[in-house]
């Protein structure tokens, strides 16, 4: 369970949105690849992602990832429409498999970074759990890789702001990904008339200097225009 703290500002800045990309290798389902190391032993592996048992409405019900001819990850009796998969390799040489199988409303049986350990792919960063308790339809993707750090964009239909996307930075330390900060930066917030981070205050809104503060710093008056910049995840 997380509590969200919103940081707001008053500067008006207009810019065109830029789609972020990460330094990864894209894999497609039902193809075999032999040019990449996914196990972390420094040698190239044979990897295949198989989507099978397609139903009348074109959804699949089975997902299998095999490495060197052996099953490393499997989902059965499930439902998804396609597979998005990428290999990301950190500066330290550790490879990870991003696997997302979306279904209705973007939800699906898996949206996670997987690490190959003892013959199996296991979740090391589950994008559906990062903001658990704050909203629905939680998914994410890696949008930048630099050294042993990744930037992820977490998309969610939140209880307070509706559809939005937030960037968080994680670093791989001692065998796991840990956030470098409790703060995330809003990439997009979708309002009724499109994407925006500017909102009109409907009623006087008290604000605080930090997430754990108890004393009100200032009050935003009804009708004032404000921009939401960041949020904090507090466990």
Label each PLM-derived region with a short phrase:
Residues 45-49, 98:
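Structural core positions within WD40/WD-like beta-propeller blades
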Residues 82-112, 120-196:
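Short aromatic loop motif centered on NTY/YTY
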Residues 2-12:
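Bacterial N-terminal signal peptides
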Residues 189-234:
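Beta-loop motif signature
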